């Protein structure tokens, strides 16, 4: 099996050694170099041609965001960001996801030392996954966000609709593409699960809200879901939807993680399967693994459901869409830029 060559970029000598040592323990990973700042990183990427780069968000000389943008422009390669869990760190990390980073690892917030071992397996796993990412999808130019004027409201709509989106690796960029193309008068609420730890989902929702014509917010337990609003599942809890008093409400579920994920797409989709008097549109986009497929099977069995999967050519990682497609539970397969139009069309039918 091919060895994956990794460049480690961090201004801390301790962190460079720690990341290098941990990655080198895996038989498929070879650390071919390290860099202390963004300028050094760009030189070493050009010279060494790594398969994956780990990149600190906060660095002197050239920070992680500026470095990332230069990497994706000049030497496109899968990048895993290494970030702090501070509010500023989370905001910068979300920006990095939308500039083309494949994924990120949050540094432990406690004292350095044994806390670092908590993210060792996550670091190794995300670097391995990043090596399989579709770099063309990360660097593809994105359509300009539309300025909405026409109304998409249908003349008669006898039944409430709800849109549920599940995504993982590469998801923040995919969510931006879809949510910024939805009209503000969308005749359905949107609920979305993005695999992401607590704290980072707040920054994700805030950034998407600033860009989209619809309202985007982090979901709150017990709130009534409103048309024209997208609700992002908070990290650390499962998001479910319940029908209560004739309204659709967001609820939190603290049951154990599913396949390592909380929130999990399967849990959201399964909760929607119990809602009978509502048309359901499920969307599965880029992500590693198969989260969402089991829940989508239950959704389809419950009836009144249409499912959209992102096409291979635009998915950063095709795992989640492929699993759903191969299970035979998908109605529409479209590239990322066409998902919003497909959602609007299905709501209007």
From Swiss-Prot:
One of its GO terms (molecular function) is phosphorelay response regulator activity. Its main location: cytoplasm. The active site is at residues 168, 195, 291. Gene3D superfamilies: 3.40.50.2300, Methylesterase CheB, C-terminal domain (3.40.50.180). Its EC number is 3.1.1.61, 3.5.1.44. Involved in chemotaxis. Part of a chemotaxis signal transduction system that modulates chemotaxis in response to various stimuli. Catalyzes the demethylation of specific methylglutamate residues introduced into the chemoreceptors (methyl-accepting chemotaxis proteins or MCP) by CheR. Also mediates the irreversible deamidation of specific glutamine residues to glutamic acid. The modification 4-aspartylphosphate is found at residue 56. Belongs to the CheB family. It catalyses: [protein]-L-glutamate 5-O-methyl ester + H2O = L-glutamyl-[protein] + methanol + H(+); L-glutaminyl-[protein] + H2O = L-glutamyl-[protein] + NH4(+). Residues 156-349 form the CheB-type methylesterase domain. Pfam families: CheB_methylest, Response_reg. Contains a C-terminal catalytic domain, and an N-terminal region which modulates catalytic activity. SUPFAM superfamilies: CheY-like, Methylesterase CheB, C-terminal domain. Residues 5-122 form the Response regulatory domain. Keywords: Chemotaxis, Cytoplasm, Hydrolase, Phosphoprotein. GO terms for biological process: chemotaxis. It comes from the Bacteria. This is Protein-glutamate methylesterase/protein-glutamine glutaminase. It is found in: Cytoplasm.
